[in-house]
Amino acid sequence: MKSGRFIGVMSGTSLDGVDVVLAAIDERMVAQQASYTHPIPLQLKKDILGMCQGQSTTLSAVGKLDAQLGILFAEAVLALLAKEGLSAQDITAIGCHGQTVWHEPLGEPAFTMQLGDNNRIAAMTQIATVGDFRRRDMAYGGQGAPLVPAFHHALLAHATEKRMVLNIGGIANLSVLLPDSPIRGFDTGPGNMLMDAWIWRNCSLPYDKDACWALSGHVNQPLLEQMFNDPYFRLPAPKSTGREYFNAAWLDKQLARIPGVTAEDIQATLAELTAVSITEQVRLAGGCDRLLVCGGGARNPLVMARISALLSGTEVCTTDDAGIRGDDMEALAFAWLAFRTLSGKPGNLPSVTGASRETILGAVHPVSSW
């Protein structure tokens, strides 16, 4: 496939909405044309969180959530098409990541589960849909994540400048794009996830807007050291994680060991944990001249300020400064991965995921004969 118009659909660990992006894509260029964020109903969000955090469930509940998410993702695509005055015939394919409810890359056997029925998306939109991107990489011994570094390299790598791309979603992940070196990428640990969980529990707010609550507190050093002592932070790459590990139950275990910390100081310490765990991994990966940040955490002034302070000598900016809207980065990546799949080209990077080989990713759900 030489070119086409693709739609990428992404619902990440932050659960702050379904991101939908339209882009014209060919071998040399990804040109974003439109974007839209579709709301996630509150009850559906609660159902997702319950499943992600290991609460007991049933096959019926899993199947129902899979169908509900397929419908939600299809509605998000249809809303974007209506907003832009487009029809199904204008679109080559959809690339849908799905909603991760469990990710266990070190299991025996390793597995990952993304819900959102791609058959339903294809049927409701009448657009060929590519999904289930992660499990083929796992079948070849990889972690199935992260997959976005290949896209970061295609768009943002530089011939001489040492660059890294940092996505701060619910989980933070880093793409290491150093000249004349293999591409690397991995999850550094919690991004917004723990901060969001804590402010939701205490203030019934979905996130700490402008870090106002965190800025009212102070970092508690014993608590920070207790949390940063978690074995995940010392694991070598390749490594990946998610809400099934860094969640409210994990936080409660840490707090039980350091009692008496005020709620606002806990929020400030969680922001510091995100910044420290990221910058430590940047240093261990060799450092960079320029750190390009995307995701919701790029709008957290405290986290961004701390990253800049901890990485003196590195220019810390957003991907918006490089011409790519940070909020759309991951959805755009899965539109690009759908293009790679339909072009018969590999989408994973063994140097990132640990897979034994490059491979074409995803399953294709057509709406007509090929």
Curated annotation (Swiss-Prot):
<dbReference type="GO" id="GO:0009254">
    <property type="term" value="P:peptidoglycan turnover"/>
</dbReference>
<dbReference type="InterPro" id="IPR043129">
    <property type="entry name" value="ATPase_NBD"/>
</dbReference>
<keyword id="KW-0067">ATP-binding</keyword>
<keyword id="KW-0119">Carbohydrate metabolism</keyword>
<comment type="pathway">
    <text>Cell wall biogenesis; peptidoglycan recycling.</text>
</comment>
<comment type="similarity">
    <text>Belongs to the anhydro-N-acetylmuramic acid kinase family.</text>
</comment>
<keyword id="KW-0808">Transferase</keyword>
<dbReference type="GO" id="GO:0016773">
    <property type="term" value="F:phosphotransferase activity, alcohol group as acceptor"/>
</dbReference>
<dbReference type="InterPro" id="IPR005338">
    <property type="entry name" value="Anhydro_N_Ac-Mur_kinase"/>
</dbReference>
<dbReference type="GO" id="GO:0006040">
    <property type="term" value="P:amino sugar metabolic process"/>
</dbReference>
<feature type="binding site">
    <location>
        <begin position="12"/>
        <end position="19"/>
    </location>
    <ligand>
        <name>ATP</name>
    </ligand>
</feature>
<keyword id="KW-0418">Kinase</keyword>
<dbReference type="GO" id="GO:0016301">
    <property type="term" value="F:kinase activity"/>
</dbReference>
<dbReference type="Pfam" id="PF03702">
    <property type="entry name" value="AnmK"/>
</dbReference>
<comment type="function">
    <text>Catalyzes the specific phosphorylation of 1,6-anhydro-N-acetylmuramic acid (anhMurNAc) with the simultaneous cleavage of the 1,6-anhydro ring, generating MurNAc-6-P. Is required for the utilization of anhMurNAc either imported from the medium or derived from its own cell wall murein, and thus plays a role in cell wall recycling.</text>
</comment>
<keyword id="KW-0547">Nucleotide-binding</keyword>
<protein>
    <recommendedName>
        <fullName>Anhydro-N-acetylmuramic acid kinase</fullName>
        <ecNumber>2.7.1.170</ecNumber>
    </recommendedName>
</protein>
<comment type="pathway">
    <text>Amino-sugar metabolism; 1,6-anhydro-N-acetylmuramate degradation.</text>
</comment>
<dbReference type="GO" id="GO:0097175">
    <property type="term" value="P:1,6-anhydro-N-acetyl-beta-muramic acid catabolic process"/>
</dbReference>
<dbReference type="GO" id="GO:0005524">
    <property type="term" value="F:ATP binding"/>
</dbReference>
